[in-house]
């Protein structure tokens, strides 16, 4: 026989249709990359592979062994797998990816940011009539291919909805770290006027002693800002999946 064959003891392997020989290692079969161990057969689930003196982790489908890339929810946690190679990112690499996509938005116009409000509405979320700050945060995670990392893929453009949900999920802290979402409540803000918990959000790109730098949609476009950690306007930070 040839193709995928069950060899017993939960071992499935693949035999070349032309030569009949057993294929091992990384193989492109039926439109997907798969990894086949000579002894244990087709790899499924999270799999460590030794390559060029280092160990990388890949995620192979639990049913057919096909290689998964991009964001994946595995073992009760979000992870990102390189879109080309499938290699699982480290948590630090995931943070750097979000920062990279955040900085790429720097200098964007107000109209660009307001366009992200329309993106949220097109994706099924509600429209915040007070500005595009949260829609911009959500767009950055989506553009990075990491929408699941932000509140498990919740879609909306109101900052208070994200803050409330992330507190409920235990995804909230008062200690800023790079890649987190900073939430704000300004004095005499619309949030106070309408009775909600937050009225602004930006992404942290740098943290110092008593301060943190953000990128977000504010008056005039998408800009950098620096805030004091002890400021009364701080109401905490949303924790994306790479810190959980």
PLM region spans:
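A mature extracytoplasmic/lumenal domain signature
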Residues: 19, 40, 64, 85, ...
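Residues that flank catalytic or metal-binding motifs in active/ligand-binding sites
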Residues: 32, 77, 178, 198-200, ...
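...with weaker cross-activation on analogous glycine-rich loops/strands in unrelated enzymes
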Residues: 147-222
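N-terminal capping segments
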Residues: 89-149, 197
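Active-site or metal-binding loop neighborhoods of secreted/extracellular toxin and effector enzymes
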Residues: 212-244
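Hydrophobic beta-strand residues in large extracellular and virion-surface proteins
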Residues: 98, 102, 137, 141, ...
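Residue-level detection of beta-strand scaffold positions
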Residues: 22, 88, 125, 181, ...
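Extracellular adhesion/carbohydrate-binding repeat motifs centered on closely spaced tryptophans
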Residues: 1-94
């Amino acid at each position: 026989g040839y193709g995928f064959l069950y060899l017993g003891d939960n071992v499935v392997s693949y035999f070349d249709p032309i030569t009949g020989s057993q294929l091992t290692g990384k193989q492109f079969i039926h439109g997907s990359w798969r990894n086949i161990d000579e002894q244990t057969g087709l790899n499924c689930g999270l799999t460590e592979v030794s390559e060029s003196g280092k160990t990388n982790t890949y995620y192979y489908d639990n049913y057919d062994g096909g290689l998964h890339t991009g964001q994946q929810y595995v073992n009760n946690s979000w992870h990102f797998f390189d879109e080309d190679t499938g290699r699982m990112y480290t948590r630090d690499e995931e943070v750097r990816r979000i920062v990279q996509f955040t900085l790429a938005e720097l200098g964007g116009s107000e109209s660009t940011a307001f366009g992200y409000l329309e993106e949220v509405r097109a994706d099924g979320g509600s429209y915040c009539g007070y500005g595009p700050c949260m829609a911009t945060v959500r767009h950055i995670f989506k553009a990075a291919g990491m929408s699941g990392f932000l509140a498990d893929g919740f879609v909306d453009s109101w900052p208070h909805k994200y803050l409330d949900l992330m507190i409920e999920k235990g995804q909230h802290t008062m200690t800023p770290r790079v890649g987190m979402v900073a939430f704000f409540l300004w004095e005499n803000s619309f949030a106070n006027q309408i009775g909600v918990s937050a009225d602004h959000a930006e992404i942290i790109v740098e943290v110092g002693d008593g301060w943190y730098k953000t990128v977000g949609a504010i008056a005039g476009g998408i800009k950098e800002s620096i805030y004091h950690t002890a400021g009364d306007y701080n109401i905490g930070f949303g924790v994306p999946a790479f810190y959980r």
